[in-house]
């Protein structure tokens, strides 16, 4: 008898109306490229990402550099092979919160092709249009038992790979 009894059906609450907000239009160019294309002087400053998870002080520093006239913030990718907050994630926050052009460095040392493509797609989705392709410093000898170099390609091949992805059209529009 217990098995024959069906659970009582309750009426579901009406579904919430989905937002009709549209996604922002993808920008075709940025201030950095506009200045370069116009032959204007561009001020680029490198500011390494923090070693801690708090970006507050970093963003304050970036804001001061922007107010002082910096057009572009370059962000190293684990300089001298020491772990820091990911340069691409920091670039996304700088772009989103400050509206400043950010150029994350992308090293060959830490990512294979699949991880590189995934990161480039994410950067593009966040509005970060440029990367600096670099080979990257090797992992210090003392740390090589625990941390491994990837180096699936060098910076020249990485740049060629990025150009080929940009040429795929719908998946990752140009410029990258």
Residue ranges: model-predicted function:
Residues 4-56, 60, 170-175:
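N-terminal amphipathic alpha-helix/helix-capping segment at the start of soluble metabolic enzymes
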Residues 2-11, 81-105, 150-175:
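Alpha-helix-loop-beta-strand connector modules within alpha/beta enzyme cores
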Residues 1, 111-126:
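Catalytic cores of alpha/beta
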Residues 15-21, 25, 130-176:
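Conserved anion-binding
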Residues 1, 43-47, 73-75, 102-106, ...:
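Hydrophobic faces of well-ordered beta-strands that scaffold small-molecule active sites
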Residues 52-65, 87, 113-120:
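Short, acidic/polar
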Residues 1-9, 127-140:
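Glycine-rich phosphate-binding active-site loops on the catalytic face of alpha/beta enzymes
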Residues 70-90, 139-150:
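Glycine-rich, proline-tolerant flexible connector loops at the mouths of alpha/beta enzymes
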